[in-house]
């Protein structure tokens, strides 16, 4: 069986590489034509795709998947409509491929510049959410990349049904149908092959739980665009406007719990802790959020707040639990974030411009926010259209990864007969 999985993955890889050579030179109009044809195919096959999703849902229930996983797995008519709108948004995005920047003459008379080009073949590994299949496929096509999609086994029927519509759209436009391929086996060995096929795959993008991303990071022989977790902070500084701080800290924690840009630790300046903490604690109590606090937090709010341990400062709860710490000022807040955080998204609430700029400069995260919720750390909210993932690494892409994150640059040299002396 291992040999057959290996042969299957080698075939998928070769087909993706061949398709990428065609896609890399496809015009914007041709790529948009393919995406529009995919839109039509999805519309025409909505009933079949939703029926396939129901098969996955029934299997999920019989396998006793938890309610959060089932929620991510489900494709409702409203979510399907949202998928289609996301595809429209990608069609409307400016195509970065072929853009030439930094063009300048050298003393020798040659012109030097940079041209934006596709990465080649993207391998994506993700869990549960079938809409990611379409988001990733559309971004790959628009950016001129072939993509190999390995979704979770719990969403296999949904992903296959969406992939059929994508293939149909590619055929209509005359682009290779293997530009987008869904791995049609639930065998975990397929992941091991995908992340080591350096001859076929140029970058791996894992989206899912920490254990999945750690495995991919440790075993991959290919560059990985990833974030391990989202331990995000909001620091309410002494000069914060509390009319802003209350809704920001409530939204950052309770808007959605199971997402990587939700706040997990609240830091409050000691100068305003006595005033601010009782108000926000009351709002959290209404939402049934469990608080785990430092000794000063517990002194102010009482014993209903559980004692925070060292582990709490490192924890991404993905649920209605929040760690709270009172700090002496901005220096302690920044030190805490840089020590315990995951370099994802961290925010300050303050009316002091100098301290806001200091926070922006010193916090080592992929997104740093002033006077707004951490929940804005998202490709759509940043104007990127859909996103293929979020990166907390510093090489290549950082933060939400949209079209430009799926591209690279090559040097171009324009001459008129010059030779090196």
UniProtKB/Swiss-Prot annotation:
Read off the InterPro entries from this record: Ald_DH/histidinol_DH, Ald_DH_C, Ald_DH_N, Aldehyde_DH_dom, G-glutamylP_reductase_CS, Glu-5-SA_DH, GPR_dom
Example GO biological process: L-proline biosynthetic process
Gene Ontology MF terms: glutamate-5-semialdehyde dehydrogenase activity; NADP binding
Q: What function does the entry list? A: Catalyzes the NADPH-dependent reduction of L-glutamate 5-phosphate into L-glutamate 5-semialdehyde and phosphate. The product spontaneously undergoes cyclization to form 1-pyrroline-5-carboxylate.
Annotated family? Belongs to the gamma-glutamyl phosphate reductase family.
**Gene symbol of the encoding locus:** proA
The answer to keyword Amino-acid biosynthesis applying to this record is yes
Location comes to: Cytoplasm
Q: Which keywords, in A-to-Z order, does the entry hold?
A: Amino-acid biosynthesis, Cytoplasm, NADP, Oxidoreductase, Proline biosynthesis
Q: What is this protein called?
A: Gamma-glutamyl phosphate reductase
Q: Name one GO cellular component term.
A: cytoplasm
What broad class of enzyme is this? oxidoreductase
Could you tell me what reaction this enzyme catalyses?
L-glutamate 5-semialdehyde + phosphate + NADP(+) = L-glutamyl 5-phosphate + NADPH + H(+)
Q: In which pathway does it act?
A: Amino-acid biosynthesis; L-proline biosynthesis; L-glutamate 5-semialdehyde from L-glutamate: step 2/2
Sorted alphabetically, which CDD domains does this protein's record hold? ALDH_F18-19_ProA-GPR
| Documented EC number(s) | 1.2.1.41
